[in-house]
Amino acid sequence: MSRASSGTATGARLFGISSVLGEYRVLIGDEGAGPSRSPSEVSFSVWYRSRAARLVIVCLVASFLVPCLTFLIAETVMGQTITTPLSLTLDHWSEVRARAHNQGVEVRKKKWITLCEAEWVMMNVGWPREGTFSLDNISQVEKKIFAPGPYGHPDQVPYITTWRSLATDPPSWVRPFLPPPKPPTSLPQPLSPQPSAPLTSSLYPVLPKSDPPKPPVLPPDPSSPLIDLLTEEPPPYPGGHGPPPSGPRTPTASPIASRLRERRENPAEESQALPLREGPNNRPQYWPFSASDLYNWKSHNPPFSQDPVALTNLIESILVTHQPTWDDCQQLLQALLTGEERQRVLLEARKQVPGEDGRPTQLPNVIDETFPLTRPNWDFATPAGREHLRLYRQLLLAGLRGAARRPTNLAQVKQVVQGKEETPA
C-alpha cells in the first residue's frame, strides 16, 4: 500500500498535480495554507512548477526561434550572391549599350539574357548559361551565327559582336573576370644527331667526308625569266665573281620583283586601304574581302529584289564584323546588288544624312561630305576617319531598309487582264 502511494506521488509530482492541489487549497483558503492569492497568480505558479508546462513552453519558444534563425541565415547567404559574366554585364548595362552603339548596333536587355541563357547554350558549343569572356567560346558561337544560308542567325550578330568587344577590349570591371591566358605551347627541340667519332685504323688512312654538291637555286641559264620571290636575299649565282663593272648600271626588274622590293623597303607605305582590324602590338591591319567570300554570300542568299530583309540582315552582319572601308562597301554592293538596286539604295541613304539638329538635311555639301559618291580621303588611322566610316555604314544600312520598302508597281498591275471565263471576284 505504501509502495502504490509512493508511485502515485511520484507521478503527481511529475505532472504537477501536487502543486495544483496545494494551490487549490491556498485558493479556497484552507487552514494553514497561508493568505489567499488571485487566480492569475495561482495559474502562473502552477505553470511555473509543472514540468510538462515548462516543456511545452520550451517547445513553443523553439518553434518560433528556428524559423527566425533559418530566415536570417538564408538572407545572409542570398546577400553573398556569386557574380557571373552575365550578371556583371547586366549590372553595367548602360556601358554595354554604349559599347554596342559605338559599333553601330543596338542591343536589348531581354534578348541579351535570352541568348546567353538559352539560345547559345542550345548550340552545344560549350557556351555556359552564366556567360563567359573566353574568346574560344565566343568564336564557336560566331561560327554558328555566321553560318551561310538558312543556318545562320543574322539577328544575333550585334550581341555576339558586343561580347567579343568586351573580351578583346575589356573595361576595368571586366578584367578581373577574364580567363587566364593560355601558356604558349613550346614544341620539343629535335634531337640533333651526335657526330660519330672517326674510325681509327693503323692500316687505312682516315679521309675527311666531303659534303655533296648542292644544286643551284637558279637555273644555269642567266636569261631565264624565273625569279625566286620567296627569299629575302637573292641566291648565289653560279660561276666565279667577276670584276665590278666600270660604270653604274641599273638592271630592268620585272613588275612583280619591283613591287616586292618596294614593299620591303617601304613597309609604312604598303597600302593606302587603311586597316580595319587590330593586329600584333595593337596595330590595325587591312583584311579585304576575298573572291570566295563574295561568291558564297551571293550564291547562298536570295537576291535583294526577292527577299530584301534577308539580304539586308546579311549586309548588316558583314558591316558589323568586318567594318569595311568605303572601297569595300562599293565592292560589296556591286557583288550583291544590281545596278538599279545600288542606285536606289544610295539615293535612300543620302536622304537620311543628318544635319546639325540631328534631322535629315537637304544641304548638298553636307550630304556629299557625309555620304560621298566618289572615293573620299578618310584616314582610318585617325578618330575622325573612323567616325566618318561608322556613320557611312549606318547610312548605308538605312538606305538598304528604305529601298526595301518599294512602292507598288502600277505598270505590272495594269498588265493583269481578266480572262473570258474568270469572274470579277
From Swiss-Prot:
<protein>
    <recommendedName>
        <fullName>Glyco-Gag protein</fullName>
    </recommendedName>
</protein>
<dbReference type="GO" id="GO:0020002">
    <property type="term" value="C:host cell plasma membrane"/>
</dbReference>
<feature type="compositionally biased region" description="Pro residues">
    <location>
        <begin position="213"/>
        <end position="223"/>
    </location>
</feature>
<dbReference type="GO" id="GO:0016020">
    <property type="term" value="C:membrane"/>
</dbReference>
<keyword id="KW-1032">Host cell membrane</keyword>
<keyword id="KW-0325">Glycoprotein</keyword>
<dbReference type="InterPro" id="IPR003036">
    <property type="entry name" value="Gag_P30"/>
</dbReference>
<keyword id="KW-1043">Host membrane</keyword>
<keyword id="KW-1133">Transmembrane helix</keyword>
<comment type="function">
    <text>Plays a role in viral particle release. Presumably acts by facilitating the fission of the virion bud at the cell surface.</text>
</comment>
<dbReference type="InterPro" id="IPR050462">
    <property type="entry name" value="Retroviral_Gag-Pol_poly"/>
</dbReference>
<dbReference type="InterPro" id="IPR000840">
    <property type="entry name" value="G_retro_matrix"/>
</dbReference>
<feature type="topological domain" description="Cytoplasmic">
    <location>
        <begin position="1"/>
        <end position="54"/>
    </location>
</feature>
<feature type="topological domain" description="Extracellular">
    <location>
        <begin position="76"/>
        <end position="425"/>
    </location>
</feature>
<dbReference type="Pfam" id="PF01141">
    <property type="entry name" value="Gag_p12"/>
</dbReference>
<feature type="region of interest" description="Disordered">
    <location>
        <begin position="174"/>
        <end position="285"/>
    </location>
</feature>
<dbReference type="Pfam" id="PF02093">
    <property type="entry name" value="Gag_p30"/>
</dbReference>
<dbReference type="Pfam" id="PF01140">
    <property type="entry name" value="Gag_MA"/>
</dbReference>
<dbReference type="InterPro" id="IPR002079">
    <property type="entry name" value="Gag_p12"/>
</dbReference>
<feature type="compositionally biased region" description="Pro residues">
    <location>
        <begin position="233"/>
        <end position="248"/>
    </location>
</feature>
<dbReference type="InterPro" id="IPR010999">
    <property type="entry name" value="Retrovr_matrix"/>
</dbReference>
<feature type="transmembrane region" description="Helical">
    <location>
        <begin position="55"/>
        <end position="75"/>
    </location>
</feature>
<dbReference type="GO" id="GO:0019068">
    <property type="term" value="P:virion assembly"/>
</dbReference>
<feature type="compositionally biased region" description="Pro residues">
    <location>
        <begin position="177"/>
        <end position="196"/>
    </location>
</feature>
<keyword id="KW-0472">Membrane</keyword>
<dbReference type="InterPro" id="IPR036946">
    <property type="entry name" value="G_retro_matrix_sf"/>
</dbReference>
<feature type="compositionally biased region" description="Low complexity">
    <location>
        <begin position="197"/>
        <end position="209"/>
    </location>
</feature>
<dbReference type="InterPro" id="IPR008919">
    <property type="entry name" value="Retrov_capsid_N"/>
</dbReference>
<keyword id="KW-0812">Transmembrane</keyword>
<feature type="glycosylation site" description="N-linked (GlcNAc...) asparagine; by host">
    <location>
        <position position="137"/>
    </location>
</feature>
